Amino acid sequence: MSKRGARTPGFWYDNNTPIPLPARILVPVYGAAIALRRALYRRGWRKRHGVPVPVIVVGNVTAGGTGKTPLTIALVAKLQEAGWTPGVASRGYGRDEAGKARWVEADTPVALGGDEPVLIAWKTGARVRVDSDRLAAARALVEAGCDIVICDDGLQHYRLARDVEIEVVDGQRRYGNGRLLPAGPLREPVARARDCDFRVVNLGQASTTAAPQAPDDAGFGEWQMRLSIDSVQPMDGKRAQPLSMLAGQRVHAVAGIAYPERFFAMLRARGIGVVPHAFPDHHVYRAADFSFGSRLPVLMTEKDAVKCRPFADEWLYSVPLKAELPAAFWVSLLDRLNKLASRQGV
């Protein structure tokens, strides 16, 4: 397997791996800082600011990817289907000129918009605004005609008032060793998640046997999200093909995401022989990255594909990923949003 760049510390998700002393020493400092910051907002010493439309925040209490982007894309699509005009506010992690706000379109260069915002715009056609100030992004979306705002990875952005919080959890890794950064993966204590309105557990492919953990407090909704792959999209512009056409064949599989093994496992489950190539999350690709030495089809996630468009050829394929949630989740969410809209006069 190709491995390049920094990786998630092994001790975050393995209780048998010793935690380095410097990491343990810094935990109380980090914990005190985040507790103070949250207390300032909860007690009103720092003010939250809202916008005149419903705001959904999608986020997690752990560092790294948990499936927020597939869920955000599914949220946008479902809201559009229900007659809403959603807009997405994002930081645009890893982009150039990170301090500059901008609109992101499907054809915006990833270096300017960030890989996840460009992917969201490409998949949904929704208005996407990247800004380190999520409140400013939300206001811009409302001014542009959006009647609901989805704040991607905004759980810790307390300055923006929100109506619905959705926590996304990796169904396999959950909360790791349960420790705060840098000794563990937690941005905030696990107890913070109980303040959210919904918990979406990303179980990955449908064949998984992982079971959700019921929350302690009554009324908190925990919902399973499964990810499915059924087709491949040639990146040279040709029509999509069934993924089944590659069953029994060997391919190079590329993933520059937080948990690349999940993508590789999904391909293997479809009978595809995988030569895995894991890159760091948000990796900036060059054509030279694909000099694998053997001429096989190269399959990658859509998040990776948007960064490879400038040098795509007939050997590169993206694999569309679809997030599937129970119908009851959508009924519960849409019912809450409709009640909010009627109160806000949207």
From Swiss-Prot:
GO terms for molecular function: ATP binding; tetraacyldisaccharide 4'-kinase activity. It comes from the Bacteria. The keyword Hydrolase does not apply. It catalyses: a lipid A disaccharide + ATP = a lipid IVA + ADP + H(+). It holds the Pfam family LpxK. It is an enzyme of class 2 (transferase). InterPro entries: LpxK (IPR003758), P-loop_NTPase (IPR027417). Its EC number is 2.7.1.130. ATP binds at T62, A63, G64, G65, T66, G67, K68, T69. Keywords: ATP-binding, Kinase, Lipid A biosynthesis, Lipid biosynthesis, Lipid metabolism, Nucleotide-binding, Transferase. Pathway: Glycolipid biosynthesis; lipid IV(A) biosynthesis; lipid IV(A) from (3R)-3-hydroxytetradecanoyl-[acyl-carrier-protein] and UDP-N-acetyl-alpha-D-glucosamine: step 6/6. GO terms for biological process: lipid A biosynthetic process; lipopolysaccharide core region biosynthetic process. Transfers the gamma-phosphate of ATP to the 4'-position of a tetraacyldisaccharide 1-phosphate intermediate (termed DS-1-P) to form tetraacyldisaccharide 1,4'-bis-phosphate (lipid IVA). This is Tetraacyldisaccharide 4'-kinase. It comes from Xanthomonas oryzae pv. oryzae (strain KACC10331 / KXO85).
